[in-house]
């Protein structure tokens, strides 16, 4: 008689975590950083159709790395969550913190109760009235949440990108300076690499706008900003 196969719970969790980390590391990186007038999102993403950066609600945006169909499912769920809560209560009641908590519950449940975890990492950000009131939350595949300030890097060779961001980031940067710092940090993954504007997906939450703060930056505008002070 054969003995039933048993895997300790600790080993199951470790295997799932390793699986998710490997999937996320295979993707291209995204960086999120604060600048003087809001929050900047920069993705190494040449695709014009498959977005890694998206608007969720008036002051809230979403960035993700990993498996596209999985984080797109989460993005759509986030939009529905925001729309329903804004309609039933008040638009001011829709916050990045509330959305991050909802995502954390979903990701945590998937990680613990299903055989395959989501291969995703997310940032949910909300532009406040000033830099001190900005909210940036980083969510990992197991539902863990971290409240970040200044900058975040996800996906790809994340250690190299984070180190480059640490060296370049300063509080109160202009948009052009923040964009250069973000792009140079993405380029740090590979010696001699240079990212052109058409290979980048860039968006901002601009606190100087009214109502909807999210806007995408087209390639000509990206080139113009990168040239400033270069």
From Swiss-Prot:
Q: Which InterPro entries match?
A: Ntn_hydrolases_N, Proteasome_alpha, Proteasome_alpha-type, Proteasome_asu_bac, Proteasome_sua/b
Q: Where in the cell is it found?
A: Cytoplasm
BP-aspect Gene Ontology terms: modification-dependent protein catabolic process; proteasomal protein catabolic process
The terms describing its cellular component in GO are: cytoplasm; proteasome core complex, alpha-subunit complex
Describe activation and inhibition of this protein.
The formation of the proteasomal ATPase ARC-20S proteasome complex, likely via the docking of the C-termini of ARC into the intersubunit pockets in the alpha-rings, may trigger opening of the gate for substrate entry. Interconversion between the open-gate and close-gate conformations leads to a dynamic regulation of the 20S proteasome proteolysis activity.
GO MF annotation list: threonine-type endopeptidase activity
Q: Which pathway is it part of?
A: Protein degradation; proteasomal Pup-dependent pathway
The entry's family comment says:
Belongs to the peptidase T1A family.
The record's function comment reads: Component of the proteasome core, a large protease complex with broad specificity involved in protein degradation.
Which PANTHER family does UniProt cross-reference here?
A: PROTEASOME SUBUNIT ALPHA/BETA
* Quaternary assembly: The 20S proteasome core is composed of 14 alpha and 14 beta subunits that assemble into four stacked heptameric rings, resulting in a barrel-shaped structure. The two inner rings, each composed of seven catalytic beta subunits, are sandwiched by two outer rings, each composed of seven alpha subunits. The catalytic chamber with the active sites is on the inside of the barrel. Has a gated structure, the ends of the cylinder being occluded by the N-termini of the alpha-subunits. Is capped by the proteasome-associated ATPase, ARC.
Name used for this protein in its record: Proteasome subunit alpha
Tell me which species this is from: Thermomonospora curvata (strain ATCC 19995 / DSM 43183 / JCM 3096 / KCTC 9072 / NBRC 15933 / NCIMB 10081 / Henssen B9)
């Amino acid at each position: 008689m054969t003995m039933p196969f048993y895997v300790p719970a600790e080993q199951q969790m470790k295997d799932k975590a390793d699986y998710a980390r490997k999937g996320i590391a295979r993707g291209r990186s995204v960086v999120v950083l604060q600048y003087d007038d809001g929050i900047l999102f920069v993705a190494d993403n040449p695709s014009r159709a498959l977005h890694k950066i998206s608007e969720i609600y008036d002051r809230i945006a979403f960035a993700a790395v990993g498996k596209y169909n999985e984080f797109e499912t989460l993005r759509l769920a986030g939009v529905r969550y925001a729309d329903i809560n804004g309609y039933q209560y008040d638009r001011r009641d829709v916050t990045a913190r509330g959305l991050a908590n909802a995502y954390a519950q979903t990701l945590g449940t998937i990680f613990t109760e299903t055989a395959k975890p989501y291969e995703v990492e997310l940032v949910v950000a909300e532009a406040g009235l000033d830099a001190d009131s900005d909210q940036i939350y980083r969510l990992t595949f197991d539902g863990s949440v971290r409240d970040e300030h200044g900058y975040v890097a996800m996906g790809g060779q994340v250690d190299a990108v984070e180190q480059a961001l640490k060296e370049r980031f300063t509080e109160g940067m202009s948009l052009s300076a923040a964009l250069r710092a973000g792009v140079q940090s993405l380029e740090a993954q590979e010696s001699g690499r240079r990212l052109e504007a058409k290979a980048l997906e860039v968006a901002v939450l601009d606190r100087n706008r009214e109502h909807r703060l999210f806007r995408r930056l087209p390639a000509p505008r990206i080139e113009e900003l990168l040239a400033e002070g270069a």
